[in-house]
């Protein structure tokens, strides 16, 4: 058996020491050995951390000589290292940081993967008390030069690209900051010599950075793809600014970006709105920077500094721990000024007190200290912008606050809404489209009895998810959704009363009697496209059913509500498809509720889940046309199966072409017809016939 190297023997002794010391209650580093490849590492010293001094030394491992661990101060050879000790509860957190950083390693632009590490050392961290060694931490440092790190931070201002023409992240496969991602050819952090290694296996499609692929009808495609001979005659000549993929990635959600702790942060100047005018989707600016409101990202996290886009309504719900809550409660909204045309706009702020804290705060069973100072937290913030042309004319903010104890514990649910209203709109209901519905707009509804009902609803659970604390949110057109809540039921619950209670809660979601066929139907005129809701017969709540007399069992409980909405495309306005509602049906489904007992059946409240779902079903506006004899016999000329489409040869001259005004299409068609007739008349047979006719006239 071969002999062990000094480094392996030292590592084994320290590891054995780290395992045995906690058993005796002695101080020990966790972990006792670290292989360091980044500029910073951390370890924890546990057990007897009072009056302990931490020192760092550099081990000179020579072949055949095992260095003896010593406890002492910093030596000259460790001036490149920094040791920070942070006390924790009964422990010490030790941070070892390399002062030079990765920039010193990547200074040589000609570095390659085959070069040795720029830092190769062995460090020993010692904990001592009164010159007596207590514990040791061995660190093997191997830091390699990062050839993918580039230093192009010459600009001091960030340029946010227009998302209408490209997504905010033009290289989706660039997942690592300041580092080269393999097979990601659009990653600007990759050096040319590194990119050559995987140039033949780059990621394709949108993930690889091809966020705006050329259309297959574009003339530039013929240079890169195999195209038929007639393609140059029928291809489309258009600049990239009119690509059919514009705006395809525009409506994206916010996603967080995590940066390493050693990354250099530069100060970026904000975008200069000299004219203070906005376009749809532009971030709203204040006199101090971007106007931000917490929003939920794609990963489900709550981003505290997410910009608000102009004319983009949203409703976000964030959940946070009250113990570490550092929210927006200290922000003075009255001092905020919105930049816009005509000068800054000062918001009008209204404060209200929350009535039921159980809807917002879920507290554990803990006893709070008596006499602690209270504090205010914002549980809801509602922002209503008034816009006119390309500017903001006003901002109304409603803040719902709650007063809680300073020692309050638990989870708090916060809600933030942003709504844009026209400057000329009053208290009337907002349209959901003109005339057809827009995707994501509320389904308009009314009650013939004059009740204040404007839409259909689903549940928005909060806290423990109980129905008593659940809020309501509108049903949005074109978005299938499922929601639910929990109803507390006792073991001795009366089944008839339970059915009536459940049915009443489900009816609250669909109090309306009619829904609007179009997005701009008039609320004051019932004949202006209002459809009566088709309601399936609800189950009889007072029926005497089997098992109804048994405690803890209730059959035929209407616990599920399904809403089906039939929609169709009813034409187009200026080339934009207009969608409308054909019918709305509500139907109940029953379940058998049974009290869930453990080892013993105690008289405690059980939870009955109630659910409500909405489904949008698209119905064709007209039956599809049967295939013609030409399509059946000549499948190679079928427009739906082949690139070549002879029936659409004159498509620009038909009424279906909406790329240009019809008058221009007619003028171009007549000009083309005139040129065609002139070409036919000037052909050789016609010229010869004219010459023959002239010769015959001369002889006569």
From Swiss-Prot:
Please list the tissues where expression of this protein has been recorded. Significant expression is observed in brain, kidney and eye.
Q: How the protein sits in the membrane?
A: Single-pass type I membrane protein
Q: Which GO terms describe its biological process?
A: cilium assembly; protein localization to ciliary transition zone; smoothened signaling pathway
Cellular location(s): Membrane; Cytoplasm, Cytoskeleton, Cilium basal body
Which ranges of this chain reside in the Cytoplasmic compartment per its record?
Answer: 683-700
Secreted in keyword set: no
Could you tell me the superkingdom of the organism this chain comes from?
Eukaryota
- Intervals, Extracellular compartment: 26-665
Give the positions annotated as glycosylation sites: 76, 82, 146, 156, 389
Inactivation phenotype: Mice have ventricular septal defects and can display right-sided stomach. The embryos exhibit microphthalmia, cleft palate and polydactyly. Embryos lack also nodal cilia. Cilia in neural tubes are scarce and morphologically defective, and failed to elongate axonemes. Basal bodies dock to the plasma membrane in Tctn2 null neural epithelium. No Arl13b ciliary staining in defective Tctn2 embryos perineural mesenchyme suggesting that, as in Tctn1 null mutants, defective Tctn2 cilia lack Arl13b. Tctn1 and Tctn2 share a common function, with both affecting ciliogenesis in a tissue-specific manner.
Q: Which residues form the signal peptide?
A: 1-25
S-S bridge residues: none
Query: GO CC terms on record?
Result: ciliary transition zone; cytoplasm; cytoskeleton; membrane; MKS complex
Keywords of the record, alphabetical order, are: Cell projection, Cilium biogenesis/degradation, Cytoplasm, Cytoskeleton, Glycoprotein, Membrane, Signal, Transmembrane, Transmembrane helix
Q: Where are the transmembrane segments?
A: 666-682
The similarity comment for this entry is:
Belongs to the tectonic family.
Assembly and partners are described as: Part of the tectonic-like complex (also named B9 complex).
What functional role does this protein have? Component of the tectonic-like complex, a complex localized at the transition zone of primary cilia and acting as a barrier that prevents diffusion of transmembrane proteins between the cilia and plasma membranes. Required for hedgehog signaling transduction.
What is the recorded name of this protein? Tectonic-2
Query: What organism is recorded for this protein?
Result: Mus musculus (Mouse)
Q: Which gene encodes it?
A: Tctn2
């Amino acid at each position: 058996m071969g002999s062990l190297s000094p480094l392996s023997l030292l590592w084994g002794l320290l590891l054995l020491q780290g395992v045995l010391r906690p058993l005796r209650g002695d101080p020990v580093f966790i972990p006792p050995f670290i292989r360091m490849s980044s500029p910073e590492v951390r370890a924890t010293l546990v057990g007897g951390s009072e009056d302990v001094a931490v020192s760092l030394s550099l081990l000179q491992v020579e072949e055949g000589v095992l260095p003896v661990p010593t406890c002492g101060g910093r030596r000259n050879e460790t001036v490149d290292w920094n040791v920070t000790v942070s006390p924790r509860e009964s422990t010490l957190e030790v941070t070892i940081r390399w002062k030079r950083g990765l920039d010193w390693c990547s200074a040589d632009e000609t570095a390659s993967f085959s070069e040795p590490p720029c830092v190769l050392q062995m460090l020993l961290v010692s904990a001592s008390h009164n010159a007596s060694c207590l514990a040791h931490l061995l660190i093997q440092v191997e830091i390699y030069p990062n050839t993918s790190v580039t230093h192009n931070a010459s600009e001091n201002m960030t340029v946010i690209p227009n998302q209408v023409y490209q997504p905010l992240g033009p290289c989706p496969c660039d997942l690592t900051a300041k580092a080269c991602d393999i097979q990601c050819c659009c990653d600007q952090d990759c050096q040319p010599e590194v990119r050559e290694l995987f140039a033949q296996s780059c990621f394709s499609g949108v993930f690889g950075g091809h966020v705006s692929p050329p259309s297959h009808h574009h003339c530039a495609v013929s240079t890169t793809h195999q195209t038929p001979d007639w393609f140059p005659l029928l291809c489309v000549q258009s600049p990239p600014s009119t690509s059919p993929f514009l705006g395809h990635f525009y409506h994206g959600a916010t996603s967080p970006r995590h940066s390493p702790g050693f990354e250099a942060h530069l100060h970026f100047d904000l975008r200069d709105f000299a004219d203070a005018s906005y376009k749809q989707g532009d971030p709203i600016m204040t006199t101090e920077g971007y106007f931000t409101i917490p929003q939920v990202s794609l990963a489900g996290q709550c981003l505290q500094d997410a910009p608000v886009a102009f004319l983009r309504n949203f409703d976000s719900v964030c959940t946070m721990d009250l113990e570490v809550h550092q929210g927006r409660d200290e922000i003075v909204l009255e001092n905020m000024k919105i930049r816009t045309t005509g000068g800054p706009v000062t918001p009008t702020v209204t404060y209200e007190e929350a009535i039921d804290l159980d809807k917002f705060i879920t507290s554990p069973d803990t006893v709070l200290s008596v006499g602690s100072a209270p504090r205010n937290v914002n549980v809801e913030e509602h922002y209503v912008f008034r816009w006119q042309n390309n500017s903001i004319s006003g901002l109304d903010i409603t803040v719902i606050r709650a007063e809680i104890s300073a020692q309050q514990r638990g989870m708090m649910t916060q809600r933030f809404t942003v709504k844009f209203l026209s400057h000329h709109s009053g208290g009337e209901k907002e349209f959901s489209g003109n005339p057809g519905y827009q995707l994501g707009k509320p389904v308009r509804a009314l009650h013939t009895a004059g009740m204040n009902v404007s839409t259909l609803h689903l549940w928005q659970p909060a806290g423990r998810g109980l129905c008593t604390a659940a809020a309501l949110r509108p049903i949005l057109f074109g978005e299938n959704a499922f929601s639910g809540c929990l109803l507390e039921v006792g073991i001795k619950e009366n089944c008839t009363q339970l059915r009536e209670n459940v049915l009443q809660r489900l009816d609250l979601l669909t109090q309306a009697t009619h829904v609007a066929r179009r997005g701009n139907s008039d609320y004051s005129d019932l004949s202006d496209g209002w459809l009566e809701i088709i309601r399936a017969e609800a189950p009889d709540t007072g029926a005497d059913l089997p098992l109804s007399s048994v405690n803890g069992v209730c059959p035929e409980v209407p616990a599920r509500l399904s809403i089906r909405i039939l929609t169709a495309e009813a034409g187009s306005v200026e080339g934009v498809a207009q969608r409308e509602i054909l019918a709305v049906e509500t139907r109940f489904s029953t379940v058998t509720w049974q009290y869930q007992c453990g080892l013993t059946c105690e008289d405690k409240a059980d939870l009955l889940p109630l659910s409500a779902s909405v489904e949008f079903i698209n119905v064709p506006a007209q039956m599809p046309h049967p295939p013609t004899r030409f399509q059946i016999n000549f499948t190679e000329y079928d427009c739906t199966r082949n690139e070549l489409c002879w029936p659409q040869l004159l498509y620009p001259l038909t009424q279906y072409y909406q790329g240009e005004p019809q008058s221009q299409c007619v003028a171009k068609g007549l000009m083309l017809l005139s040129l065609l007739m002139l070409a036919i008349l000037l052909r050789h047979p016609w010229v010869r016939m004219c010459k023959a006719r002239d010769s015959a006239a001369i002889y006569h």
